[in-house]
A protein has these predicted regions:
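N-terminal nucleotide/polyanion-binding subdomain common to many enzyme families
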Residues: 1-81, 207-230
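Hydrophobic/aromatic beta-strand patches that form the interior of the parallel beta-sheet core
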Residues: 4-6, 34-36, 88-90, 113-114, ...
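Short, solvent-exposed amphipathic alpha-helical segments in soluble enzyme
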Residues: 20-24, 105-109, 130-131
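Short glycine-enriched loops at secondary-structure junctions
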Residues: 38-41, 119-123
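S-adenosyl-L-methionine/SAH cofactor-binding core of RNA-modifying enzymes
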Residues: 63-119, 162
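Structured adenosyl-cofactor binding patch, chiefly the S-adenosyl-L-methionine
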Residues: 123, 127-174
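Internal, active-site/partner-interface "lid" segment
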Residues: 148, 160-200
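SAM-dependent methyltransferases
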Residues: 189-268
Length: 268
């Protein structure tokens, strides 16, 4: 997958893109991520990339000229709505569609993305219109700029690109847990300050471990994100009768509570 990131602050991305999973994926040639400094395309002698908005208002607005020239330099042609842009351009914007796992899966299936990071009070609307940009938000809160949001987008999308994660991790991402919150996890030692790891996880019975994880995920999702739980129930079928039995118990129970040793009904 090819990803171009346009920003006024490319240095913010160095640690995120250079290490861990994203760094290894680039070394393997699975991801091709390039950073471009929008300021390099400013025609102002001081590399100015912003100005006051027409009609007044607080703050500064990113200029159209550097953004247009920057996009065209990396091969993006515009002309929307009459002409479809040559590349999919995403503008990280608080007024955009809120990013969710469904949209992440869709974006992960694409081979070419351009991500524009706004700053100050945003960008000239003509940039959005001419290049047919998709506006995406990562939540209902305010950030200083689009760089952090772009990092979230790149990381979440890259994880679903084949080969970026190990086979085991990739399979888990597309398993029955997709759409549910993650189950609790433990590592050594088995007992720490009087707190023990649930016995089922150390017993070696892989089927029981699988069912325990599923039940924990269901319980956490129903308790903390009932919206996700409802969506999961409507769109996902239990893979076998054992999972179905657990799911039906949660559908028929008003409230469940998570315990370290397992799941218990609060009404008991």
């Amino acid at each position: 997958m090819k990803i171009d990131i346009l920003t006024l602050f490319p240095e913010m991305f160095e640690a995120t893109l250079g290490g861990s999973i994203l760094g290894r994926a680039q070394e393997k040639g699975i991801l091709d991520i390039k950073l471009t400094n929008i300021r390099d395309y400013s025609k102002d002698k001081h590399s100015k990339a912003d100005d006051y908005p027409f009609g007044g208002g607080a703050g500064m607005l990113m200029l159209a000229q550097p953004i247009f020239d920057c996009l065209e330099a990396i091969g993006v042609t515009g002309g929307a709505p009459e002409k479809k842009p040559s590349r999919h351009v995403i503008y990280m914007s608080p007024r955009g569609r809120v990013l969710d796992q469904s949209r992440i899966r869709e974006l992960a299936s694409e081979q070419d993305l351009v991500i524009l990071c706004g700053h100050y009070e945003g960008i000239d609307q003509r940039c959005i219109d001419y290049f047919g940009m998709e506006e995406i938000s990562i939540g209902d809160y305010v950030l200083t700029g689009g760089e952090l949001a772009a990092m979230v987008l790149v990381d979440s999308v890259a994880r679903l690109v084949p080969g970026v994660l190990s086979g085991e991790d990739s399979a888990m991402g597309e398993s029955i847990y997709s759409g549910l919150l993650e189950y609790p996890q433990y590592t050594k030692p088995r007992e720490f300050r009087g707190m023990e790891v649930p016995e089922v996880l150390t017993g070696g019975n892989h089927k029981l471990i699988e069912l325990w994880k599923y039940e924990q995920s269901l319980a956490l999702t129903k308790e903390r994100r009932p919206d996700l739980f409802e969506e999961y129930v409507q769109n996902t079928a239990a893979p076998d009768k054992d999972h179905k039995k657990i799911l039906e118990r949660y559908l028929n129970s008003d409230k469940m509570k998570v315990y370290a040793s397992g799941i218990k009904d609060e009404k008991e």
